[in-house]
């Protein structure tokens, strides 16, 4: 049985052209060196809320568990203080 040796270059090209290929996720907060997520930073918090108003899970965003808990608390505080809407039905 003969084996075909594949180049890494061809493998990368195939992965980029494949529509099912997904890049490795990383934690934005770890890279940035954030210690505490602030509930007043609405631009960052909006990135982690889906179109329907739900908090996006860590398995989709790549956020570490430590930061996901902080993110969850920060979003809930911002909602409680009326800085962010609870649902997608409210307009800013």
From Swiss-Prot:
Organism: Cupriavidus pinatubonensis (strain JMP 134 / LMG 1197) (Cupriavidus necator (strain JMP 134))
Gene Ontology CC terms: cytosolic small ribosomal subunit
Protein name per Swiss-Prot or TrEMBL: Small ribosomal subunit protein bS18A
Subunit structure: Part of the 30S ribosomal subunit. Forms a tight heterodimer with protein bS6.
Keywords (A to Z) from UniProt: Ribonucleoprotein, Ribosomal protein, RNA-binding, rRNA-binding
Pfam families the UniProt entry points to: Ribosomal_S18 (PF01084)
PROSITE patterns assigned to the protein according to its UniProt record, in alphabetical order: RIBOSOMAL_S18
Keyword RNA-binding belongs to the record: yes
Described function: Binds as a heterodimer with protein bS6 to the central domain of the 16S rRNA, where it helps stabilize the platform of the 30S subunit.
GO function terms (MF aspect): small ribosomal subunit rRNA binding; structural constituent of ribosome
GO aspect biological process, one term: translation
Matches recorded under Gene3D superfamilies: Ribosomal protein S18
NCBIfam families: S18
Lineage top rank: taxon: Bacteria
Family statement: Belongs to the bacterial ribosomal protein bS18 family.
InterPro entries: Ribosomal_bS18 (IPR001648), Ribosomal_bS18_CS (IPR018275), Ribosomal_bS18_sf (IPR036870)
The gene coding this protein: rpsR1
